[in-house]
Amino acid sequence: MVVLNPNNWHWVDKNTLPWSKDYLNGKLTSLSTVSSDGKSKIELTQVSSITGDSNVSQRKGKPICYFDLQLSMNVKVTNLDTNKDDEDDDGILADGKLEIPEFMHDESDIPILSQGFDAFDGLVRSEFVPKVVETLLKYQDDLIKEHSKDIQV
């Protein structure tokens, strides 16, 4: 959808939440890493919820974006060490959630809450959460790149 601004109005907005959901689902569900000791694999299996607001606007001829999103993701830790017995039949060592209560356009410090990882919480936080943050920090640039061309002066 192209948003026209024939009289150069002060603000032009475009709702980008549907695109954001597709983008974040695509980028995040492909994330996985093998632990530094090589004994386990951590992977994001599902983005279970994305809510909030995401918009690209034009003000005085310049594209800007603003978003305030809440995300919930399912993550599992699986065993790669064939000598270990703490797993269930599928090799799953832990199955938990990562929650992001506020992912905002003006914050680079993203709070991430974890639950359900028990003994593997430290591993998930130290070796997987940085990959999630790295992916999320690319979102704003990609959002503007994708949608600023749709807002015309």
UniProtKB/Swiss-Prot annotation:
The keyword Lyase does not apply. The lineage of its organism: Eukaryota, Fungi, Dikarya, Ascomycota, Saccharomycotina. It comes from Saccharomyces cerevisiae (strain ATCC 204508 / S288c) (Baker's yeast). PANTHER family: HEAT SHOCK PROTEIN 90 HSP90 CO-CHAPERONE AHA-1 (PTHR13009), HSP90 CO-CHAPERONE HCH1 (PTHR13009:SF15). It is found in: Cytoplasm; Nucleus. Co-chaperone that binds to the molecular chaperone HSP82 and stimulates its ATPase activity. Although not essential, it confers thermotolerance when intracellular levels of HSP82 are limiting. Monomer. Interacts with HSP82. This is Hsp90 co-chaperone HCH1. It comes from the Eukaryota. One of its GO terms (molecular function) is protein-folding chaperone binding. Belongs to the AHA1 family. The keyword Ligase does not apply.
